[in-house]
A protein has these predicted regions:
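Single conserved hydrophobic/aromatic residue that forms the stacking wall/gate
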Residues: 1-12
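Short, low-complexity N-terminal leaders and the immediately following helix N-cap/first helix
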Residues: 10-82, 112, 343-368
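Short, glycine/charged-enriched hinge/interface segments at domain edges or termini
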Residues: 16-21, 72-248, 383, 388-389, ...
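Conserved active-site and cofactor/substrate-binding residues in soluble primary-metabolism enzymes
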Residues: 16-23, 37-40, 44, 68, ...
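Flexible glycine/proline-rich
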Residues: 38-44, 52, 98, 119, ...
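Helix-rich terminal scaffold detector
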Residues: 14-21, 191-318, 322-328
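Residue-level signal for inorganic ion chemistry
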Residues: 28, 70, 167, 203, ...
Length: 433
């Protein structure tokens, strides 16, 4: 419920407590809206949800047509046809796709027809070319064709309006256009369609110690890896990412970048400066000029996450630790961006897998450990193995992980052979497993 979700924010912004992930997700989703509707070429809509119904302007197909190359016939002429008593018909014309035979087929007549061509008036079946004997000529007008079997009414004929009638909805608002669906839209008369615009997501890296990837860091410096990862993740979620650069630990510099991003974007994300340290200027800015709805989540990695509103725009402050920023984006930013783009709300698919080793958990928070799930080639069983280290600063474990091992709240000892839940970060939302 939207009002309940917004109310949760009122509760948590007044209390310095670790909030459950589900509450955090509900708060974020309740404070983002779908973007404006724009019109784009239909072929560019592949992978995107439509903003409105697509309605056929004509019947699809507008005429009955042949499903294969052959001869259009009156089935009544061939009711007695057999190998012992074949029926011979006069070929009175030839028809190909785009070249219409204007006449009508009468008793004892047939027309050579190609796949996709309109079935001539009077014909109610098509006999495929391979089983017809041409007695003389080249098989076109002036030839005779011999048939050795009956033809059923409708045989090898695609009916008019078989796909849709004029006025039918061929694709509903919210339905994601498949590549082949672009062809369906074209058949319904759509050269362009309406979708929700890609939300502009402003990304800012915070920290005096950060340098651009192109620079060699000096002692005490590190390359800014989070901005590249977050830009890629935002793009994958359906956003238009905009990088505003690296802000040093300076209150004025941070404020200038955050204000600019807030003016120009639909959603602002920062990484770094989200802990309770001395240099957490951005959370103080949001608290002073907007509102902070929560600033800690019962989750690892990603405990120190701030969400609020600044200038009426959603703001998400992620940890500077790469793994924490990644999990925070997956759990909070990605669902929000997809909602803004018009996708149905949802999360990555979750499936069960068998642990290949033991896992001990002593903290109460929910864990999302980087892992790899594979199917045993002999038994078909899904097996999940954690990365050797869960150090949140190591990027290689995120590159090679295809899932997050989800361990719910509370201490526990998991043993090899236990069945656990894994979040498939390699699969899109809505995937049926």
């Amino acid at each position: 419920d939207l009002r309940m979700s917004r109310g949760l924010g009122d509760v948590y912004k007044r209390q310095e407590i670790l909030i459950p992930l589900e509450d955090a997700q509900a708060i974020v989703l309740s404070h983002v809206n779908r973007t404006e509707v724009v019109e784009i070429p239909a072929w560019q809509a592949a992978g995107l949800p439509l903003a409105e119904d697509a309605v056929a302007d004509i019947d699809i197909s507008p005429f009955a047509n042949s499903a294969m190359d052959g001869y259009a016939v009156r089935s009544a002429d061939l009711t007695q046809a057999s190998d012992e008593a074949p029926v011979t018909l006069d070929v009175i014309g030839h028809e190909a796709a785009g070249h219409v035979f204007e006449g009508a087929i009468g008793a004892g007549e047939t027309v050579r027809i190609m796949t996709g061509a309109p079935v001539p008036e009077g014909a109610d079946a098509v006999v495929k070319y391979e089983i017809v004997d041409v007695l003389d000529g080249d098989g076109n007008e002036g030839s005779r064709a011999r048939f050795s079997a009956p033809a059923k009414v409708g045989e090898n004929v695609r009916s008019a309006a078989e796909e849709a009638h004029a006025g039918d909805v061929v694709m509903h608002a919210g339905e994601v256009v498949a590549p082949a669906g672009a062809g369906l839209l074209a058949s319904a008369g759509y050269a362009s369609v309406k979708v929700h615009a890609a939300p502009r997501v402003g990304i800012i890296s915070l920290g005096t110690e950060l340098v651009a990837p192109s620079k060699v860091p000096a002692r005490g410096q590190i390359r800014d890896s989070n901005s590249s990862a977050l830009m890629a993740e935002a793009l994958d979620a359906g956003a238009e990412p905009v990088f505003y650069g690296i802000a040093p630990d300076d209150e004025q510099a941070i404020a200038e970048l955050v204000h600019r991003a807030t003016r120009e974007c639909d959603f602002v994300i920062t990484s770094g400066g989200a802990s309770a340290g001395d240099y957490d200027y951005v959370t103080a800015l949001v608290r002073r000029e907007g509102e902070v709805l929560f600033d800690r989540i019962s989750m690892r990695p990603g405990k120190a996450i701030t969400f609020g509103l600044l200038g009426g725009k959603p703001y998400l402050g992620l940890s500077g630790n790469p793994a924490a920023a990644y999990v925070g984006f997956e759990m909070l930013a990605r669902p929000a961006i997809r909602k803004m783009r018009g996708f149905a709300e949802g999360v990555r698919p979750v499936q069960q897998a068998t642990l290949t080793h033991g896992v001990k958990k002593r903290q109460h928070r929910r864990f999302f450990d980087r892992a790899t799930v594979l199917r045993d080639p002999e038994t078909g069983e899904l097996l999940v193995t954690e990365a050797k280290t869960q150090n949140s600063a190591l990027l290689g474990t995120m590159q090679r992980a295809n899932c997050l091992l989800r361990i719910d709240e509370g201490p526990c000892d998991l043993a090899a052979g236990d069945v656990v839940d894994v979040v498939r970060v390699d699969l899109p939302e809505g995937t049926v497993l």
